[in-house]
Regions:
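FIC/Doc superfamily catalytic core
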Residues: 1-184
């Protein structure tokens, strides 16, 4: 059996730091303003990549009914990181996000799960694009952090299919941020 390829988190961080270093310049070409790409945001996203890498390595299926809550963990990680003190600080927001995630009848996880199950046998590209659009479309799946969480869930799907993850880079930043604005 071939050993599972793991993410090079240092390479992911390098790519993100390149974007961060030129974010002000890049954002001049975005169709709508974006929040600053701070060190905290960057490090939380890297922790998110470590998390999805672990899920893939352990063979976890995020779209199994028993595992859907792990998408909330990805979202919490991009917002707060893995630090327990930050999780306590944001406990009310995380609880509100969980309620929104499970109880939103117009979008929510039920809609995403049903869509994914209906298209499970389609190409990975169609599934990844459909999942991303459903996460970002109104009503968005999470209260905050939908772009970052969505790109990590897409990366997870790509990695499970043996493909490289999506990583924000200088080459794809404009293409990533502008369609994300239109989807919402």
């Amino acid at each position: 059996m071939q050993p599972m390829r793991r993410l090079d988190l240092s390479a992911v961080e390098r790519a993100l730091r390149e974007v961060q270093g030129r974010f002000a310049e890049l954002s001049q070409h975005f169709t709508e303003p974006r929040d600053p790409f701070t060190d905290e945001v960057l490090l939380n996203v890297v922790e998110g990549y470590a998390l999805i890498d672990d899920y893939v390595a352990r063979g976890i299926d995020l779209f199994d009914l028993q595992q859907l809550n792990l998408m909330l963990e990805i979202n919490a990680t991009v917002l707060c990181g893995r630090d327990p003190a930050r999780r306590v600080e944001f406990a009310a927001h995380l609880a509100a996000t969980e309620a929104h995630f499970f109880n939103n009848v117009e979008g929510g996880i039920k809609d995403l799960h049903n869509w994914y199950c209906a298209y499970r046998s389609d190409s990975i590209w169609k599934r990844a694009a459909g999942v991303y659009v459903r996460i970002l479309s109104k009503p968005q799946l999470f209260i905050e952090g939908n772009n970052r969480t969505g790109s990590l869930i897409v990366s997870y799907l790509l990695m499970r299919a043996g493909l490289p993850p999506f990583v924000l880079s200088l080459d794809n930043a404009e293409g990533y941020f502008n369609p994300s604005s239109v989807i919402r």
